[in-house]
Structures are given as C-alpha cells and as structure tokens.
C-alpha cells in the first residue's frame, strides 16, 4: 500500500496530511486559504493521488507559513508513500494549457531536491493570495519530497490561469512519475541501485 499519514506541528502551523498514491484523485483540503485550497484540489484531482490535508496556521499574520508548511508536509508524505521507489517510472513531464497560460513541468523523483521555477506573474496577487507563495510551495515540496522540479511559463497573461496551469502540470507529471512500471516492477529506477 503506497500510502502515508503525516502530522507536523510547529509554533506557526498544525498540519495533518494523508496521501494514497494509488487513489483516484479524491481530495479533502482545508487550509483556511481559499485560493490555495483550490490549487491543492487541482493537484490531487489531476495527479490521481488521494489527498486529505488539514492545516491550522497563523493566518492572522499572513498565508506564508501555511502554504510553505503544507508543501513541507506533502513532500514528506510523498517520500514516505514512495518508500524505496522500487518499480516506479521516476520521471514525469507535461505541457499544460489553460486558456492563455501554457506551463511546462519536468520532474525527477531522484531524492535530490532542486527547483527551477520560471513563473513570472503579471501581478503580485491573485485576489488576496500572494503569487510569490506559488514558488514557496513548490520549493518546500521539492525539498521535502526529494524532487528535482522544473517549471516554466511558456505563455500566460492571467495570474489565476498561470498558477492553476502550474499546479495541474505538476500534478500530471507526478501522476506519470509515481506510476508503477510493469516492465521494471521490482527494480529501483537507478543504475546506482538506490534513490
């Protein structure tokens, strides 16, 4: 069973996250940050990873700790659920078009965190959501999930569309990367013998 259940508590946030890599994309996300919840819904739905996420954060300050810490906890959950990564495809990539926005994602579940995030937003906010938090989330996810993650905006005019295209592109790439490879069912996808 490729599942994980993570609880993380700090002075800034209290988070619980459950994931099932072999799910159907069911989600139950409640962070108190509406736009971020919407993005996380997209991540679950389009990756086919079941995600249940609860976060109580210091939203009286701002959304930063909530968004970043959710990325940390989700990255930890993915790492736990993947185990030794035996039999997975490991790599995933996707071009995601959403109206005016076109985002390319390529990722490697290598155990070596690295983020390249070229997502210039046309404004500092989407409603009340700070667009810089999109990068903060993906940085935390990459670092704590051991993911090499490249995200590039090829075209885009609308901030909401850019953010949503990015989350969906990551979702579709994750879907591909965590998928079991029937031709290499018992193999770790690395010539080093470990990831």
Swiss-Prot record:
Keyword tags: Amino-acid biosynthesis, Cytoplasm, Histidine biosynthesis, Lyase
EC number(s) stated in the UniProt entry for this protein: 4.2.1.19
UniProt KW Zinc-finger keyword: no
GO biological process terms held by the UniProt record: L-histidine biosynthetic process
Catalytic activity annotation: D-erythro-1-(imidazol-4-yl)glycerol 3-phosphate = 3-(imidazol-4-yl)-2-oxopropyl phosphate + H2O
GO molecular function: imidazoleglycerol-phosphate dehydratase activity
InterPro entries noted in UniProt: IGPD_sf (IPR038494), ImidazoleglycerolP_deHydtase (IPR000807), ImidazoleglycerP_deHydtase_CS (IPR020565), Ribosomal_Su5_D2-typ_SF (IPR020568)
GO cellular component terms given for this protein: cytoplasm
Subcellular location: Cytoplasm
EC class of the enzyme, as a word: lyase
Keyword Oxidoreductase among UniProt keywords: no
CDD domains: IGPD
Chief place where the protein resides: cytoplasm
Pathways per UniProt: Amino-acid biosynthesis; L-histidine biosynthesis; L-histidine from 5-phospho-alpha-D-ribose 1-diphosphate: step 6/9
Entry similarity comment: Belongs to the imidazoleglycerol-phosphate dehydratase family.
Protein name from the UniProt record: Imidazoleglycerol-phosphate dehydratase
Taxonomic lineage of the native organism: Bacteria, Pseudomonadati, Pseudomonadota, Alphaproteobacteria, Rhodobacterales
Gene field: hisB
